Amino acid sequence: MKVFTGSAEAALNKAAEAVLSLVRTKPDCVLALSASSQLDGVYAALRESGADFSRCTVFLAEEFVNVEDASLTRRAKLEAAFLSQAGISRVHCPDAAGCEGYEAEIASAGGIDLALLAIGRNGRIAFDEPLAAFDSTTHVTKLTESAQQEECAAFGANPPSQGVTVGIHTLMRCRRALLVALGSERAEAVHKAVAGRTHISVPASLMQLHLNAELFTDEAAAAEL
């Protein structure tokens, strides 16, 4: 796994440049995108780039299950952060009742060219929590307390308890994977992901086995490397 370390701004811009490079060479590319708040700066850079994303196809990497307020969904967050302003209309979202169908949609689109993900404090990627099976495809999962604390602040005292996510195997099949980790609270997870043994207890560490994975961190997140 290649690692880029710099300021938070530099790391986010570098990740955005990787996405833009693909979009410019393959305008009809297929992207798997997480709605993690860690990626807000990447999406801001993409919005400001002036690039044409209209031919891209997007598959959301994760979504909450049984959320009544549509404005609190991962799709709504990603629409506000990037999709609507980028003019992307071909957007697919995982559904708890259609996991196999989601994999079929990805295959029908030609597979994922690039996945943009964040590393959680517990080493998760998307909603693939610790101990997610290496051969997992899109599936429903219980959200850990760590995930709820990081990604469910808008829900107040009643965060969703389940999510649906692309699986580790799904991500291993993507042609390129970009991971982002910022802040000292992710330093331990980054160390385990990059320098630790590959194990399902730290899903991000499994990306060491990916042939084209890159990690973008700031100095704080890379402090234990």
Describe every region a protein language model picked out.
Residues A45-F53, P130-V140, A195:
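A glycine- and small-aliphatic-rich helix-loop capping segment at beta-alpha/alpha-beta transitions
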Residues F53-L116:
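Ligand-binding beta-strand-loop-alpha-helix segment within the catalytic cores
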Residues R124-I168:
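Class I SAM-dependent methyltransferase SAM-binding "motif I" and its flanking Rossmann-like core
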Residues V67-E68, G123-E129, A133-S136, E188, ...:
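Short acidic/glycine-rich loop or secondary-structure boundary segments that cap or lie
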Residues M1-L31, V91:
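N-terminal glycine-/serine-/threonine-rich phosphate-binding loop
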Residues L33-Q38, L117-R121, L182:
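Glycine-rich beta-strand-to-loop/alpha-helix junction loops that act as flexible
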Residues H169, R173-L225:
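ATP/nucleoside-binding phosphotransfer catalytic cores, i.e., glycine-rich phosphate-binding loops
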